[in-house]
Amino acid sequence: MFCIIGWRTNRTTEDLGKRRMQKQSSTSLQSPAYSFGEFFAALISAFDRQGLRLCVLRNYECFPSSNAGRDVDLLILASELPRAYLALQSISGIRVIGYTERRYVASFFLSGIISESKARALQIDFDLSLTWKGLPFLSEKEVLEAAIPRPAGNLIFYTPCPVHEAVISLLASLLVGGWLKEKYLPKVQQVFADDRLAVIASLSPTLGLKVATQLVDSVIGCDRRKVLGCVRSLRWSLVLRNFLRRPEHSIGAVFKHYASELRFRYSLEILQTVRIAGTDVCDRRTVVESLISILQCSAVLVEARSFGSMSGLSSQLPAEDSRADPHAQSYRGLFGSVATVLRWLLQEWKSQFLGNRNLTLRISESNFCDLLIDPRRYGYAGPMWIARFAGRLFPPAILWVLLESVLEKANSRKLELSSAETLRQREGYLSFVRRGNNYIILDSGKAVESIIEDAYLAIIDTLAQRTDCKLKTRF
């Protein structure tokens, strides 16, 4: 299956790493993917064994046969999170490949579930509190106690009562984000109109009678402008009432909320990068495009990133299907080359910390090693020691996937290169990925479907190993 696999380890033999990956990948292949209905039934049973109620907050209308969204939102108490993790862990054939936690929500990313077209993963969000900036607008304990049982075949799961569901659906976007989620608005309006007094009574303890009444009547009147105009008063009322009732607790809650958000958003673990390397650009792009499809839901965002989009060097290159000699491109000059390398380094670190508000899996189809191995192709005229030094400063990838081309195939794709140069580049890529990186080497001469499946399994194994270490520390 896999040609070679290596890890950061003091052991020098690659055979040991190869056997380890083959063992893990065979386990993955022996566990067929669940349909959503099969997984949901297993999840209910697992929760029952842990003595937990499975309370689904929204988008449950098609349960258990199908899931209308790309995730499942469940409500539990924060103290129940360890047992919820044990419930997920007990489901045979499911692997936890990602985990993030904030003060108000813990997200698990599970592989082995058919959730979308071609995708094989599902995001499970455990809402731990119903808050804004750490200040509660509704008691999660009261919501769970008032939850209504709903049949799912021979099993039962729970949903919030209509009043609580409507309030949560409205305020989750209005109070937290300052916007209306049109998808839920008709149902919210209907519940508010049918149970106006009950909704006001539910909101009054945290928002006050006047603000709660104004909001409910604006929703019933279908006046979106007035509803959005309530955002400021909603937030101020929530802050004032919490600070007047429990000032020390509220100050601590707000401080912990912002500290948690800063730690989460600027963590190196929020962006995980897999780099696809190899001499054949066409092979790399085909693999990346296919991986993006089947890796959906393996993180909040699964994206592709290319060398050209970061470096600005792509404008110099001919089209990939062109037979023009890429080495005939003009050089940038010494200072221009060095500036380009440094700019790309800064952009890589900037993208590592900024713009990623949730867990992101990035598949990079070309890498800085391309420049190190074939500098002429990119018009680089600077000292190679600067390029190599900058390469060591780049954010580390969690996995390198090297597509090792058969020499004959590489020569047929790159007619402008001599056999000796093609061989040199091939050896250069092999040497680069073996330099202490977590890597896998695949034979690009095999069928494309087989290459993609092997790469997918390697990525899932890597994500699962990293997540397992993280969860052992957390739980």
Predicted regions, residues:
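NTP-dependent small-molecule kinase module
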Residues: 229-232, 236-247, 411-475
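A glycine- and Lys/Arg-enriched "phosphate-lid" helix/loop adjacent to the NTP-binding pocket
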Residues: 366-432, 438
